[in-house]
Amino acid sequence: MGYDVTEYMARYLRGETDIPMRRHRVLAVTCADSSRWIVDAGIGQAAFRRPLPFAEGAERTINGETYHVVKKDFYGWVIEDWHNGAWRPFYGFTEEVQLNLDYIMPSFWCEKHPDSPFTKANMLSIKTDTGRCTLDGNTFRCFDGDTVTEKELTDEEIPSVMDSVFGIRL
């Protein structure tokens, strides 16, 4: 297909005060022209939607959100986003190649461990053409450019929103 994919494991840094475990899959894509790109399926928060150049100092603005790539001694390659007038760390990864089996333990931790943020409440996100919609616990938000709409859902409303917005039928 004209490109090679290498998988890495990242430490999600946004909002962390301690060094977090590696638990996020990141792809590095090398194209036929030797250009390298960082590719990510995303998370439920603001995250880059299109590949970032895999080069120190690279910067890209996507749908009004600006990201850049820096190198740090401990974290390796760090993706940062411009937020409230300052660069905010998003995640960091080193270039240690990962295999599918390397994701089993972090995936299990995310799904089952009592300290995992994913075991505490509903956590869904879907990208839209102009933003994203999220369900975090009972809080439903849609981000459309600079506009955010928010609604606290009742437990009875959640199945309908999961179906109509996220395509999940309970």
What annotation goes with each model-predicted range?
Residues K72-L170:
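N-terminal accessory/pre-domain segments preceding catalytic cores
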Residues Y3-H68:
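Hydrophobic/aromatic-rich core segments of domains that either
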